[in-house]
Amino acid sequence: GQLNYFVGRDFYNSKMKYKNPPIPKDVIGFDLYINWDEPIVLCEGVFDAIAIKRNAIPMFGKTIPKKLFKKIIEKNVKKVFLMLDEDAKSDSIKITENLINFGIDVIYIAMEDGDPSDLGYERSLELIKSSREITFKELIGHKLNGKTKRYMEI
């Protein structure tokens, strides 16, 4: 195959942990390994997806690439788990709203203890298993309040 994307990672605890190339991010990471008939997990980075292991797709940032969004709709995905970093809550709400508008069940997972690559597979799996779907009422409430609140108890 051909290289379609890469990312660098700093292991010396600098402020910027990851470095993405200055190219378009309209790539679907691990596309060949995704079972589109099963629930998918959307996360920010490649290392997050690797830590989650099963049906995880890196978005290469805090927003969902158009190509990925289109494929989720075309493949008629029924359920999406959203595991974005703590600093991406407002982006999570936008993604959730867009997916709900297409009839997709969204389960937002509050990542208050770090990102999936920090937590590892076991803890990420625990969070997925203990999560619940966001209701339309909760989404509207958030938008009206203009505040981010947790949608699940951990």
Residue ranges and their predicted role:
Residues 2-79:
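Phosphate-handling DNA/RNA-contact segment within nucleic-acid enzymes
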Residues 41-42, 73, 77-83, 92-154:
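Replication-associated primase and helicase/ATPase modules
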Residues 51, 90-92:
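Extracytoplasmic/secreted cell-surface and envelope-processing proteins
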Residues 59, 84-86:
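Short glycine-centered, acidic/aromatic-flanked micro-motifs in structured strand/loop junctions
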Residues 65, 88-90:
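Alpha-helix N-cap/loop-to-helix initiation residues
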